[in-house]
Amino acid sequence: MILHAQAKHGKPGLPWLVFLHGFSGDCHEWQEVGEAFADYSRLYVDLPGHGGSAAISVDGFDDVTDLLRKTLVSYNILDFWLVGYSLGGRGAMMAACQGLAGLCGVIVEGGHPGLQNAEQRAERQRSDRQWAQRFRTEPLTAVFADWYQQPVFASLNDDQRRELVALRSNNNGATLAAMLEATSLAVQPDLRANLSARTFAFYYLCGERDSKFRALAAELAADCHVIPRAGHNAHRENPAGVIASLAQILRF
């Protein structure tokens, strides 16, 4: 089994750019940014429970890494960068720390490196279980209306929230709930030590209005790019800013 993805081919000799979306996104999420790099071959992946991979379920990040590895092999991708946002960023960090042959580096936007104590994990598990129950049982428009009121999305205005609620409500609530629980921060290990000892290039992107993840970025041994005029979802709020940072990283 492999993950559904959309592949766009560029010039030979350059590494692939493999894009991983955030929770409730899909393979289209990164395309505005990715298509600015047409010289590179691009793979836009649907994570389990999302988009064309909605029917695929996992028990945790080990399964996600295994599926990603098999997907890369199926496309004969031997040399690549992982670019991930939020959930996709966490998946990228996990996979990179577990080891992926051919990995050039990891570019993470707003991805959490992991909680650091049992109390934080227990609190997050309670929260994610409550959200998962709502995703399973309530209309998605109502759930996402509340989801985007969370503090991490404070930089969004009302129009941006309405647009995101409409977009994300096309998902399957049951498969979102399953993925939320399987990849909760409550079950993700703290990756700080692994990232400090890494053997791959590691870059971190965060919006200038995303105070939580700017603080987290400061804890990581990563080259951090702050995206102006953006909050947590920087590639959506300021795609040109993210394109500029990726171009600098890739020396495009």
Swiss-Prot record:
<dbReference type="InterPro" id="IPR022485">
    <property type="entry name" value="SHCHC_synthase_MenH"/>
</dbReference>
<comment type="pathway">
    <text>Quinol/quinone metabolism; 1,4-dihydroxy-2-naphthoate biosynthesis; 1,4-dihydroxy-2-naphthoate from chorismate: step 3/7.</text>
</comment>
<keyword id="KW-0456">Lyase</keyword>
<comment type="pathway">
    <text>Quinol/quinone metabolism; menaquinone biosynthesis.</text>
</comment>
<dbReference type="GO" id="GO:0009234">
    <property type="term" value="P:menaquinone biosynthetic process"/>
</dbReference>
<comment type="subunit">
    <text>Monomer.</text>
</comment>
<comment type="similarity">
    <text>Belongs to the AB hydrolase superfamily. MenH family.</text>
</comment>
<dbReference type="InterPro" id="IPR029058">
    <property type="entry name" value="AB_hydrolase_fold"/>
</dbReference>
<dbReference type="InterPro" id="IPR000073">
    <property type="entry name" value="AB_hydrolase_1"/>
</dbReference>
<dbReference type="Pfam" id="PF12697">
    <property type="entry name" value="Abhydrolase_6"/>
</dbReference>
<comment type="function">
    <text>Catalyzes a proton abstraction reaction that results in 2,5-elimination of pyruvate from 2-succinyl-5-enolpyruvyl-6-hydroxy-3-cyclohexene-1-carboxylate (SEPHCHC) and the formation of 2-succinyl-6-hydroxy-2,4-cyclohexadiene-1-carboxylate (SHCHC).</text>
</comment>
<dbReference type="GO" id="GO:0070205">
    <property type="term" value="F:2-succinyl-6-hydroxy-2,4-cyclohexadiene-1-carboxylate synthase activity"/>
</dbReference>
<protein>
    <recommendedName>
        <fullName>2-succinyl-6-hydroxy-2,4-cyclohexadiene-1-carboxylate synthase</fullName>
        <ecNumber>4.2.99.20</ecNumber>
    </recommendedName>
</protein>
<keyword id="KW-0474">Menaquinone biosynthesis</keyword>
